[in-house]
From Swiss-Prot:
Keywords: Early protein, Signal. InterPro entries: Poxvirus_TNF-rcpt-II_C, Vaccinia_virus_B7/C8. It comes from the Viruses. The lineage of its organism: Viruses, Varidnaviria, Bamfordvirae, Nucleocytoviricota, Pokkesviricetes. The keyword Kinase does not apply. The keyword Signal applies. This is Protein C8. Residues 1-21 form the signal peptide. It comes from Vaccinia virus (strain Copenhagen). It holds the Pfam family CrmD_SECRET. Belongs to the poxviridae C8 protein family.
Length: 184
């Protein structure tokens, strides 16, 4: 049976250039990731550790933000655009963090599957970790929610050219999972 799959894959490669057409592919060249967190923990001070791509590993980048009692990690893998800018906004019990790409990057290649993994971890764990995912596990949000009331994650895949910027696709992930409201 595996030899039949191998021959079928070779046939698809000769026609399409790869073994399968990717139903989730978007030709984006910029990322915009927004994280809204509601928490009772201290939001200042914080430190940001931004690991831009390096010549030894151009497939993965991550940003880690440390607060007193929790930390947030955003990791991208096989994404053409990298997170090169981070903006942090705080008020009372709300934390808004924007991770995005401002520099010019190549368009996402169809033969590379970009994944974005966002984790929010509390220093003192009192609950089990929960994970939500979208688009065949490409985009994920996970947290133990021990020190957070809720977490909302928005991911925008953006295409730019000399005259226009277009959001090709947006994804929303929430913890705890809850139903969206319906507006008439």
């Amino acid at each position: 049976m595996s030899s039949i799959r191998f021959i079928a894959c070779l046939y698809l490669i000769s026609i399409f250039g790869n073994c399968h057409e990717d139903p989730y592919y978007q030709p984006f060249d910029k990322l915009n990731i927004t994280l809204d967190i509601y928490t009772y923990e201290d939001l200042v001070p914080y430190t940001v550790d931004n690991d831009l791509p390096n010549p030894n590993d151009d497939t993965t980048s991550f940003v880690k933000i440390y607060f007193k009692n929790f930390w947030i990690t955003v990791m991208t893998k096989w994404c053409a655009p990298f997170i090169d800018t981070v903006s942090v906004y705080t008020s009372h019990d709300n934390l808004n963090i924007q991770f995005y790409s401002r520099d010019e990057y190549d368009t996402q290649s169809e033969d590379k599957i970009c994944t974005i993994d966002v984790k929010a971890r509390c220093k003192h764990l009192t609950k089990r970790e929960v994970t939500v995912q979208k688009e065949a596990y490409r985009y994920s949000l996970s947290s133990d929610l021990s020190c957070f009331d809720s977490i909302d994650l928005d991911i925008d895949l953006i295409e730019t050219n000399s005259t226009d910027t277009t959001v090709l696709k947006s994804y929303e992930l929430m913890l705890p999972k809850r139903a969206k409201s319906i507006h008439n």
